[in-house]
Amino acid sequence: MAKQGSKEKKGYPELKEVIKATCKIRVGPGKETLTEGNCLWALKTIDFIFEDLKTEPWTITKMYTVWDRLKGLTPEETSKREFASLQATLACIMCSQMGMKPETVQAAKGIISMKEGLHENKEAKGEKVEQLYPNLEKHREVYPIVNLQAGGRSWKAVESVVFQQLQTVAMQHGLVSEDFERQLAYYATTWTSKDILEVLAMMPGNRAQKELIQGKLNEEAERWVRQNPPGPNVLTVDQIMGVGQTNQQASQANMDQARQICLQWVITALRSVRHMSHRPGNPMLVKQKNTESYEDFIARLLEAIDAEPVTDPIKTYLKVTLSYTNASTDCQKQMDRTLGTRVQQATVEEKMQACRDVGSEGFKMQLLAQALRPQGKAGQKGVNQKCYNCGKPGHLARQCRQGIICHHCGKRGHMQKDCRQKKQQGKQQEGATCGAVRAPYVVTEAPPKIEIKVGTRWKKLLVDTGADKTIVTSHDMSGIPKGRIILQGIGGIIEGEKWEQVHLQYKDKIIRGTIVVLATSPVEVLGRDNMRELGIGLIMANLEEKKIPSTRVRLKEGCKGPHIAQWPLTQEKLEGLKEIVDRLEKEGKVGRAPPHWTCNTPIFCIKKKSGKWRMLIDFRELNKQTEDLAEAQLGLPHPGGLQRKKHVTILDIGDAYFTIPLYEPYRQYTCFTMLSPNNLGPCVRYYWKVLPQGWKLSPAVYQFTMQKILRGWIEEHPMIQFGIYMDDIYIGSDLGLEEHRGIVNELASYIAQYGFMLPEDKRQEGYPAKWLGFELHPEKWKFQKHTLPEITEGPITLNKLQKLVGDLVWRQSLIGKSIPNILKLMEGDRALQSERYIESIHVREWEACRQKLKEMEGNYYDEEKDIYGQLDWGNKAIEYIVFQEKGKPLWVNVVHSIKNLSQAQQIIKAAQKLTQEVIIRTGKIPWILLPGREEDWILELQMGNINWMPSFWSCYKGSVRWKKRNVIAEVVPGPTYYTDGGKKNGRGSLGYITSTGEKFRIHEEGTNQQLELRAIEEACKQGPEKMNIVTDSRYAYEFMLRNWDEEVIRNPIQARIMELVHNKEKIGVHWVPGHKGIPQNEEIDRYISEIFLAKEGRGILQKRAEDAGYDLICPQEISIPAGQVKRIAIDLKINLKKDQWAMIGTKSSFANKGVFVQGGIIDSGYQGTIQVVIYNSNNKEVVIPQGRKFAQLILMPLIHEELEPWGETRKTERGEQGFGSTGMYWIENIPLAEEEHNKWHQDAVSLHLEFGIPRTAAEDIVQQCDVCQENKMPSTLRGSNKRGIDHWQVDYTHYEDKIILVWVETNSGLIYAERVKGETGQEFRVQTMKWYAMFAPKSLQSDNGPAFVAESTQLLMKYLGIEHTTGIPWNPQSQALVERTHQTLKNTLEKLIPMFNAFESALAGTLITLNIKRKGGLGTSPMDIFIFNKEQQRIQQQSKSKQEKIRFCYYRTRKRGHPGEWQGPTQVLWGGDGAIVVKDRGTDRYLVIANKDVKFIPPPKEIQKE
């Protein structure tokens, strides 16, 4: 007893964590779990029953022993209830001991039963658990079916470790996850079918998922039975599922196929349920929202469950289960209170009864009253129960004598599941109101039907505003027969009987109307002919949002909606608008806006040709403030991408926009105002409930909505070709005529359920069919308008010309001809009423297009055949044709020429567009046919002229673009142009001289061949229709006479020459050898070889011969403050002759006003930008307007004299060796120093050392430099840090909008900088590799920026062997040197940027200035110091290696651990970290000696012989 007392006191501490885990297992389907007391009671009871096991520790072995003994007990030895509780609690403790986590007690019992109870090895029952399960703790085999050595097979139970691993995966990732599927497929390869299904059933998981898995397995079994009729060698479903088999029988080889099929079924079921769980409509994801009523939640849930492709029993189970588990907490509590323990088995109707008031104010007050009410006595059942059917306490709704109420129709006597109207979900009775608009309308059935008495019979007729006639299938012969009548509608052309004066009655309204009797009609229709007489109107705005989903739209961030006042309207327009708005309000399309909706959009109206008013809304401001939606449809469908079909039908959706609801929170921004005439009353404000016309998102919302509605229907009909663009629907098929019309009829009925109507008069059945501006025929397609209007010579406005060209461009897919002259005519004045003049060339172009449109016909796409695209040159454009058979184009098109692209590049651009069109319209990659020869295109690709080629291409001999018949090698009447071009005096020049005395020359860069061709091009530009060209270039001469029909153009100059020559009447081309004494040829050669006065830019004007200078133009408006100087850069670069220099002077008109030019000398050969320095001597500000002549450039002859010494007779007081006290002629170096400084802006020390001028003269040069004075740097040096050879600092700096990465070597001051794309780690690591390759650094200092401290950066530094340290950002002590370098770099860069075209070039020039041109105190640059340090390192390393190469030592050897005598000295042959190798002279052997037995000595000195 003492032991027992201690046991009770301790409370089984070794099982503390096990008991804690056991307390999380639920007792049943509710939330009640096991307690610690339950576990202690079970353990104590077991100790009491089995005293021989009491002293043993609670291991898994003991638990299995106790479990075996409990199974041997009979219930009579203890009470049945306590025995069952004891066994169940022990099973839970055993599962927790093994690390398993069953959800319920029942699941725990199943797991233990599977692990022990399924074993059929009865001989091992009495053995210990370790012997029975040798692999319980660590498993070596996972297969229950094992091959015996003696032959045959045996069965072995699934091991607990395997089961535990599967259970863990199921709990962590889910029962239908891919991870669980892979694990199960791995372990279950040789399991029996029974093992597979039992393990799957015992896995933790959602009960609904398990039911779905079971349903999928049943479907697989049914499919097996259908596909495999019973036979002698056919497996049955029972054999596959392991029903009625022992484990030994199921493990035999003849059942391998059955096991594999069973495993395949299970994997398929898991995948199916997993895919279902990922779908948006998955019912298990449908959960009740906090603000949602339980009825709305159930409606969404039932809709999702009904859409699931599962059997009815599974749907029933899902409805019963998910209606409770997915409900909100309040509803679950209410159902628990009302339905008690049977809440899981209660029907959906009972749960709806229980929760119908949840969330209402009364419900909240009821909960509050219950919370404040004192608790009643125990045992008073039913006192607080209340019937939600009659409201009386004491009984539940299902016990109410008044009868249960249906929550669908509201009538008593039946439940919702038995309601007859349930199948007509969404239908309402006549006179009901639509939930979204609350507007009365005739019928809300889908499709809408009403009861009408026709003759003597009552019939249900479909209300169809698109039908002209009323059609019935039978008639009682009342009325007046009018013979046969032919109708054309959705069923094609049909014939019926017409009856007039027929008695028609709707409610109390009776009329005499006309009907058509058509026995074959699938539906009886009430047409427009009788609807108006009966007073029936069908509203097209079906705003029931449960049917048509609304698309969410909203304003842009920060916008408040439009607030534009309504402008005044005339009385006539107000009356027209009132009539329209009243009709819209009656139909529920607009509603009265509340006072707090303050937004407003102006409205107005125009009168149509018919005399009716049309309402227009100015949505421009609202469109600006509204967020855009994605484009639902990126373009029009094209008939060339349609497949040929036997039957086609074109449908048109009536009132498409007005059928779709507008997103309700957005409606407040669509308000508009109806004014009151003369302000006799308050204005009436309305808002839109449907998609309004003119709103920018109406097309996108409409298209997205139709996509949602039609997606399922299209998937169910894969045999048809379906197309939709806005409200136009195309249906094509190869089915029979009746079947095709049946599908069309089905679609009409389907979309009619959503309120969309298809007007009968807009339906087109069969060919020819008009669709989206195209006319479809059985074998071809055309445009609806086959002809273009004619144009005649004479004036035409730009507006009319644009409309004509727009009509042509729309039809280019059948015309395929370019109109360059007409397009050029559209250039110039953009005013719409500006006039152009049509000439004969324009008329000819237009007529060619009109003729092509008449002749061309498009064909349909055949998916069995390949598609080809053939490109060819047109008139200043590229034309291509897409076809599958020669002569039968699908479509054609034109790509107009693009400037600055060669012909080859333009063809490739057109090929890219062609390929894109074909892929979009057919989904295939076309085979491209290019004009010319394959080797030419391959050469273009290799030369880099083009960078893309089609995937599949070949060549054909294209049509001739340029003709050579007007180029001959004979003299033609007309002037002669002597052309020449080439590199003259280091510069490219070209020009020509004519026989009439005209001259032309320009400077231009290029090769000699290019310049020769350019000279011919300029001559062709200026020459008349007939002319002669003389050249000394054999290359240019042969090119002009080449056979251009087969030539693929290789450069743009040749292409331009061909185009110019093509427009000439006749050209004679002649060649003369150069430098052979031909006067005209030598003259043109001399002419372009001269260095002539040339200018670039628009900042200078030509002068008259008598003028002194050339006027310079002010580039922009300049303001000069009083007494200030301003430097103005003008748009001018000038190239002076050798014997010229120039001076910039003041204009007299400016000098009179006190504005002067401060000098300016331009040396001969200067080619930089011209700058003018202006000084304002006035005491007030002066403004120089743009374009004003404000200075003049004066050319001066250059006079140069050689300086000679004064001679011996001349004396000077300043020195004995000539001019200057230094005795050197340094004065000659000052201009050179100034010129060098203007290039690089180096410091005075550098100039002093490089040019040998005095320090003061060098400082004067720097001080007189305006650029250096403006960008003068501060001289304060802030902070410092580690400096040394090969130690660098790095940091980013910004110059304007550019990012520069700057490195500086701390010892020499050498700078390395690169412009980078961003401050990213990847960019920094790329630049690090470049930096390392050039400088081989050893250490680096940076701040803590993310690019520098990234893990990848640290790994790179470690890989390169660079010691990387980081400092503190913004701390001058940490990054002093690189921060100083930033300032130096940017100041120098600012000086050099005007001298370079590219920023990268200016940056490179800055590095030259700072690294090479900048000299230190000892006359060395940073580059000199860096190179010197590297050379010293090399010398030291070489010396060190030589010293370490030969070493000598004394050594001793050991015998049995005892050291011997020292021997030596001798040379070390090899040295390692712990030992050396020497050669023993006595034995002539190589010995390995440990370093502890070695004494190194200096090498012996050589004794010099006397």
UniProtKB/Swiss-Prot annotation:
Keyword Manganese: no
Annotated Integrase catalytic domain residues: 1270-1430
Domain Peptidase A2: 459-530
Biological processes per GO annotation: DNA integration; DNA recombination; establishment of integrated proviral latency; nucleotide metabolic process; proteolysis; symbiont entry into host cell; viral genome integration into host DNA; viral translational frameshifting
UniProt-annotated binding residues for Mg(2+) 2: D980, E1012, D1032, D1085
Reaction equations catalysed: 3'-end directed exonucleolytic cleavage of viral RNA-DNA hybrid; Endonucleolytic cleavage to 5'-phosphomonoester; dUTP + H2O = dUMP + diphosphate + H(+); DNA(n) + a 2'-deoxyribonucleoside 5'-triphosphate = DNA(n+1) + diphosphate
Keyword hit for Nuclease: yes
Catalytic residue positions: D464
Bridged cysteine pairs (disulfide): none
SUPFAM superfamilies: Acid proteases, DNA-binding domain of retroviral integrase, DNA/RNA polymerases, dUTPase-like, N-terminal Zn binding domain of HIV integrase, Retrovirus capsid dimerization domain-like, Retrovirus capsid protein, N-terminal core domain, Retrovirus zinc finger-like domains
Protein name, as recorded: Gag-Pol polyprotein
Organism: Maedi visna virus (strain KV1772) (MVV)
Organism taxonomic ancestry: Viruses, Riboviria, Pararnavirae, Artverviricota, Revtraviricetes
Annotated gene: pol
